[in-house]
From Swiss-Prot:
<comment type="subunit">
    <text>Homohexamer.</text>
</comment>
<feature type="binding site">
    <location>
        <begin position="18"/>
        <end position="21"/>
    </location>
    <ligand>
        <name>ATP</name>
    </ligand>
</feature>
<dbReference type="GO" id="GO:0033862">
    <property type="term" value="F:UMP kinase activity"/>
</dbReference>
<protein>
    <recommendedName>
        <fullName>Uridylate kinase</fullName>
        <ecNumber>2.7.4.22</ecNumber>
    </recommendedName>
</protein>
<dbReference type="GO" id="GO:0005524">
    <property type="term" value="F:ATP binding"/>
</dbReference>
<feature type="binding site">
    <location>
        <position position="65"/>
    </location>
    <ligand>
        <name>ATP</name>
    </ligand>
</feature>
<dbReference type="InterPro" id="IPR001048">
    <property type="entry name" value="Asp/Glu/Uridylate_kinase"/>
</dbReference>
<dbReference type="GO" id="GO:0005829">
    <property type="term" value="C:cytosol"/>
</dbReference>
<dbReference type="InterPro" id="IPR011817">
    <property type="entry name" value="Uridylate_kinase"/>
</dbReference>
<feature type="binding site">
    <location>
        <position position="60"/>
    </location>
    <ligand>
        <name>UMP</name>
    </ligand>
</feature>
<keyword id="KW-0665">Pyrimidine biosynthesis</keyword>
<dbReference type="GO" id="GO:0006225">
    <property type="term" value="P:UDP biosynthetic process"/>
</dbReference>
<keyword id="KW-0547">Nucleotide-binding</keyword>
<feature type="binding site">
    <location>
        <position position="80"/>
    </location>
    <ligand>
        <name>UMP</name>
    </ligand>
</feature>
<dbReference type="Pfam" id="PF00696">
    <property type="entry name" value="AA_kinase"/>
</dbReference>
<feature type="binding site">
    <location>
        <begin position="141"/>
        <end position="148"/>
    </location>
    <ligand>
        <name>UMP</name>
    </ligand>
</feature>
<comment type="pathway">
    <text>Pyrimidine metabolism; CTP biosynthesis via de novo pathway; UDP from UMP (UMPK route): step 1/1.</text>
</comment>
Amino acid sequence: MAQQMSARNPRYKRILLKLSGEALMGSEDFGIDPKVLDRMALEVGQLVGIGVEVGLVIGGGNLFRGAALSAAGMDRVTGDHMGMLATVMNALAMRDALERSNIPALVMSAISMVGVTDHYDRRKAMRHLKSGEVVIFSAGTGNPFFTTDSAACLRAIEIQADVVLKATKVDGVYTADPFKDPNAEKFAELTYDEVLDRKLGVMDLTAICLCRDHSMPLRVFNMNKPGALLNIVLGGAEGTLIEESNE
């Protein structure tokens, strides 16, 4: 089976995978579930094994949510800086899981953390990607008021990724929340303008506009489905594809 997979040519040479911090919680209410980390590391390792270059951005919502404390009175900039640190913690945990699976990985941070991570450098990141290392981009964009979704799209554009893959707990984009509305229908494909016009909430406005303005395809899929990530990279139609209109 593994030989058959490696014989197939990947559809994408370089991807940017966006994971939510909540995805790392697994069945826990807070923090990081080591079993989830190990499973994700193996799935990423499958991609590296067939020659795909992988950039990673992980949210921090499993450890800290600046927006929630901001609503309770905390200074928004302070809260966002704390959220950036949470993403660094998740990135370090993911690097450890990858390296324990013998997958070389590098953590880069948008805020300087000498001795803990490398500082973000686009050219250096691309060199490491080309050498087969997984590069994990942490601390968002380094600026408050920007989400990790926006950071993922920005880094994807900077490293010239072929696609942004957004891992969620549902298998694509729906007309409504499928957990609340049993009649919600899934979209197979959408354009950026349709996402904006329908206010589907796939990502924040900044992230969607970045992808649209730079013709960066975006696919939303369920990371909890075994093999979904590999299937996408090999050309499978998992989840929902969002790209610019052909008109």
